[in-house]
């Protein structure tokens, strides 16, 4: 988001002490600027590297190409654009104590900034709805939200985000009328984001608060449903363990189905936790800024400019967090290690040992325990049971046995964010 006031005030904090030696003061200022330049450069590198890694992993490995991960790709694209087109220019604005790219790019840069934040939270909102259908209607999930439908939803998210960000700024609906704002708009070297009260409140509600409320409400419902499912699993497993062993031997498949169903819901619950961490981190990083953004237009002098800029950069840093959070997923960990050459052909076995045919059934390489050949914990999590011919599920995933209909179609979410 745009900066208020003189951005360099935040950097030149060491000048607060009145040093008599101007050379010493200048050296302190230069050291401070160099230090901030290094920190900001590391932030940019972390954002770009991490999100390129996420996008590449999903594009390269078919296992990761789930509906939910399509939305994760959209989120990573928003973070990547933030790292390439927003954060570097924001850093330059602060470090150089002036804007050197002209008025047109100033408004265009601000529009991209608002676009990325809006697209991110709207994508998170869509992910919350996606998880709601996945956990409440697992049998209908794949027909409700196919990959083609997911692409349409992603396109709609970016179109809506583009309209709510570019249109008001490029049409100058955001502009304030006080003297400082008018002078800044006319000055090529000024790119402080002065806004009128109506725009600040309306844009904050549309771009942040409204999607946030929807996201929190839907995700709270998802967790309530997930909690009830886990409680049912606990009760079912309790009854299962009290059965006579002879009955279990006579009907081993029912026990196997129960274990497989339990694994599915436990993995689904872990996926919910991972996505919950992503949403919670985004909220914690951006909520303080949007609170300050509204407070500032209501009471101009209440929030120091340094605080505004600092909170803005806390929001920027959020774009570097998501790739780290994805490492909770064994699938993403293996993919990242493979891409970084830290794991010798890990995904070669991971992708080729078991493959599904067009009928939804599973073809194997001929080894009865092929999925257990990897000794790492990640592989154990991905392939916990060597399926028999009666199990019409892919080896890396775990789905409830009743998620397969009579034609062999798999209605599980097969979510790789686990």
Swiss-Prot record:
Origin superkingdom: Eukaryota
List of glycosylated residues: 6, 15, 23
Q: Where is the composition biased (Polar residues)?
A: 400-418
Q: Name one GO biological process term.
A: positive regulation of bone mineralization
Q: Where in the cell is it found?
A: Cell membrane; Early endosome; Golgi apparatus
Q: Which residues lie on this side of the membrane: Cytoplasmic?
A: 59-70, 129-151, 219-274, 328-418
Instruction: Provide the Gene Ontology terms for cellular component.
Output: apical plasma membrane; ciliary basal body; early endosome; Golgi apparatus; intercellular bridge; mitotic spindle; neuronal dense core vesicle; nucleus
Residues where 4-hydroxyproline is found: 387, 400
Under Gene Ontology molecular function, one entry of this record is:
beta2-adrenergic receptor activity
- Quote the PANTHER family the UniProt record gives: ADRENERGIC RECEPTOR-RELATED G-PROTEIN COUPLED RECEPTOR, BETA-2 ADRENERGIC RECEPTOR
Assembly behavior = Binds NHERF1 and GPRASP1. Interacts with ARRB1 and ARRB2. Interacts with SRC. Interacts with USP20 and USP33. Interacts with VHL; the interaction, which is increased on hydroxylation of ADRB2, ubiquitinates ADRB2 leading to its degradation. Interacts with EGLN3; the interaction hydroxylates ADRB2 facilitating VHL-E3 ligase-mediated ubiquitination. Interacts (via PDZ-binding motif) with SNX27 (via PDZ domain); the interaction is required when endocytosed to prevent degradation in lysosomes and promote recycling to the plasma membrane. Interacts with CNIH4. Interacts with ARRDC3.
State the name under which the record lists this protein.
Beta-2 adrenergic receptor
Please name the gene that encodes this protein. Answer: Adrb2
């Amino acid at each position: 988001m745009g900066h208020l006031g003189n951005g360099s005030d935040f950097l030149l904090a060491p000048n607060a002490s009145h040093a008599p030696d101007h050379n010493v003061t200048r050296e302190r200022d230069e050291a401070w600027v160099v230090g901030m330049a290094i920190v900001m450069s590391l932030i940019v590198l972390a954002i770009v590297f991490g999100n390129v890694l996420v996008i590449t992993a999903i594009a390269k490995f078919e296992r990761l190409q789930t509906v939910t991960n399509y939305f994760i790709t959209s989120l990573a694209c928003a973070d990547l654009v933030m790292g390439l087109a927003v954060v570097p220019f924001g850093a330059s604005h602060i470090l150089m104590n002036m804007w050197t790219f002209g008025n047109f790019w100033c408004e265009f840069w601000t529009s991209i900034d608002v676009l990325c934040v809006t697209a991110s939270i709207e994508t998170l909102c869509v992910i919350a709805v996606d998880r709601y259908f996945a956990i409440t209607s697992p049998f209908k999930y794949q027909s409700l939200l196919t990959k083609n439908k997911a692409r349409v939803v992603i396109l709609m998210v970016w179109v809506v985000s583009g309209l709510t960000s570019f249109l008001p700024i490029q049409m100058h609906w955001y502009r304030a009328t006080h003297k400082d704002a008018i002078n800044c708009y006319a000055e090529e070297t000024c790119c402080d984001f002065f806004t009128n009260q109506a725009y600040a409140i309306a844009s904050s509600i549309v771009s942040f608060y409204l999607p946030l409320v929807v996201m929190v409400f839907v995700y709270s419902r998802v967790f309530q449903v997930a909690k009830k499912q886990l409680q049912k699993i606990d009760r079912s497993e309790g009854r299962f363990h009290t059965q006579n062993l002879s009955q279990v031997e006579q009907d081993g498949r029912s026990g196997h189905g129960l274990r497989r169903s339990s694994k599915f819901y436990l993995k689904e619950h872990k996926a919910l936790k991972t996505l919950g961490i992503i949403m919670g981190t985004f909220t914690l990083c951006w909520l303080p800024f949007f609170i300050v953004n509204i407070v500032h237009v209501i009471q101009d002098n209440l929030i120091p400019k340094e605080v505004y800029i600092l909170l803005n950069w806390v929001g920027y840093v959020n774009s570097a967090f998501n790739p780290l959070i994805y490492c909770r997923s064994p699938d993403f960990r293996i993919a990242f290690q493979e891409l970084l050459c830290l794991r010798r052909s890990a995904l070669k076995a991971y992708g080729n040992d078991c493959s599904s045919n067009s009928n939804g059934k599973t073809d194997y390489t001929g080894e009865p325990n092929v999925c257990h050949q990897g000794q790492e914990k990640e592989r154990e999590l991905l392939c916990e049971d060597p399926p028999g011919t009666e199990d019409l599920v892919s080896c890396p995933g775990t789905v409830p046995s009743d998620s397969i209909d009579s034609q062999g179609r798999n209605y599980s979410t097969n979510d790789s964010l686990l």
